[in-house]
A protein has these predicted regions:
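Short, well-ordered alpha-helical segments
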Residues: 15-57
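C-terminal edge-of-domain segments
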Residues: 62-74
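Short, solvent-exposed loop/turn elements at beta->coil junctions and helix N-caps
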Residues: 7-8, 55-59
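Compositionally biased P/S/T/G-rich terminal and signal peptide-adjacent segments
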Residues: 1-20
Length: 74
């Protein structure tokens, strides 16, 4: 699944499906960003998404919070 921090994908028309988010915890063995991406992908897949756009990250003492918009190509 494509994950980008822009609000568009070149040469693609998009249908917005909803906001998805993920959390990566600093004290786990898995990488924080990878963990957050995996959680977002699961939510987006459940919505039938092809990609997640406009992804934003918030870093904290205990990990990372990521949120973006799940979209379907039309």
């Amino acid at each position: 699944m494509l994950i980008v921090n822009t609000d568009f994908i070149t040469d693609q028309r998009l249908q917005t499906l909803g906001i998805v988010h993920g959390v990566g915890l600093a004290f786990t063995r898995k990488g924080e960003i990878s963990q957050a991406h995996e959680e977002m992908k699961k939510e987006a897949s459940a919505l039938g998404a092809d990609a997640i756009i406009n992804v934003r990250y918030t870093y904290g003492e205990r990990g990372i919070f990521a949120a973006g918009t799940a979209v379907r190509f039309i």
